[in-house]
Amino acid sequence: MIQAQTYLNVADNSGARELMCIRIVGASNPRYAHIGDVIVAVIKEAVPNMPLERSEVIRAVIVRTCKELKRDNGIIIRYDDNAAVVIDPEGNPKGTRVFGSIAGELRHLNFTKIVSLAPEVF
């Protein structure tokens, strides 16, 4: 569960390394965000000489959470970190690569470009 002031790792090569959530956009619960929810975040740590800079406000979609995700078939998924992928206003990823595994629920939420870039979808 991601809420305001939560720090997240960035799972792509957009130039940001660490984000802090400042607002949850379009989720069923406006207080907590889960996998597949879009958040507004500020970049807390960035790679030098990249398009995204520190203290820039961006949108991101959550791809991994430490909080368990229970599927309809009974499988429970839990990741080691909270991670997000930086997206543009249309929902396309800003980076060209995605690192680590992501949840398959993103495919049903129309983030198919992120799913196609991921090395492992679970």
UniProtKB/Swiss-Prot annotation:
Assigned GO CC terms: chloroplast; cytosolic large ribosomal subunit
Keyword Cytoplasm listed: no
Predominant location category: plastid
Signal peptide: none
GO terms of biological process kind: translation
Keyword annotations of the record: Chloroplast, Plastid, Ribonucleoprotein, Ribosomal protein, RNA-binding, rRNA-binding
Molecular-function annotations in GO: large ribosomal subunit rRNA binding; structural constituent of ribosome
Localization per Swiss-Prot or TrEMBL: Plastid, Chloroplast
Xref: InterPro entries: Ribosomal_uL14 (IPR000218), Ribosomal_uL14_bac-type (IPR005745), Ribosomal_uL14_CS (IPR019972), Ribosomal_uL14_sf (IPR036853)
Subunit structure: Part of the 50S ribosomal subunit.
Function: Binds to 23S rRNA.
Family: Belongs to the universal ribosomal protein uL14 family.
Entry-linked HAMAP family: Ribosomal_uL14
Name listed for the protein in its UniProt record: Large ribosomal subunit protein uL14c
